[in-house]
């Protein structure tokens, strides 16, 4: 977990990046993850704009949960997805990349080694207070670290 706070006008922005334990992890590890994340969320002032992004290793599915998810998630909710939804309910957060209808390739963020299965396990969380500001939320499973780095580094030609 990492966090950065940007000073801005009229609001400061706090961004948290997470990597949640997988379903193979001990249950206690999952509990520690959410406890640590909750502690981290207590640090910035409540008026900050808050983003939490990352690999949640959870499937929230396409079933809408009012105030938390839209109906445009991928697949069927699993236990980790239910835990993520409960965390969002407790903290007034939206799972933004379930709010907008998109092509399936813009939803899935994990592909099985044999290429037969895709899951949506990476999410962008945003405070419910700021719902009207969200215009789009997309993921790109095909974007590699090398592509990201190449786009950030100056051209050396």
PLM regions with names:
Residues 1-157:
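A shared catalytic/ligand-binding motif for oxyanion handling
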């Amino acid at each position: 977990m990492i966090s950065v706070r940007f000073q801005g006008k009229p609001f400061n922005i706090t961004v948290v990046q997470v990597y949640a334990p997988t379903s193979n992890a001990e249950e206690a590890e999952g509990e520690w993850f959410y406890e640590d994340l909750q502690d981290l969320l207590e640090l910035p002032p409540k008026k900050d704009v808050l983003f939490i992004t990352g690999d949640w290793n959870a499937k929230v599915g396409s079933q809408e949960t009012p105030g938390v998810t839209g109906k445009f998630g991928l697949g069927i909710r699993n236990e980790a997805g239910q835990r993520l939804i409960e965390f969002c309910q407790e903290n007034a957060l939206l799972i933004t990349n379930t709010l907008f209808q998109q092509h399936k390739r813009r939803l899935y963020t994990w592909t099985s080694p044999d290429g037969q299965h895709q899951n949506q396990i990476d999410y962008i969380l945003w405070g419910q207070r700021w719902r009207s500001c969200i215009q789009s939320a997309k993921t790109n499973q095909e974007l590699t670290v090398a592509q990201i780095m190449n786009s950030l580094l100056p051209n050396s030609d």
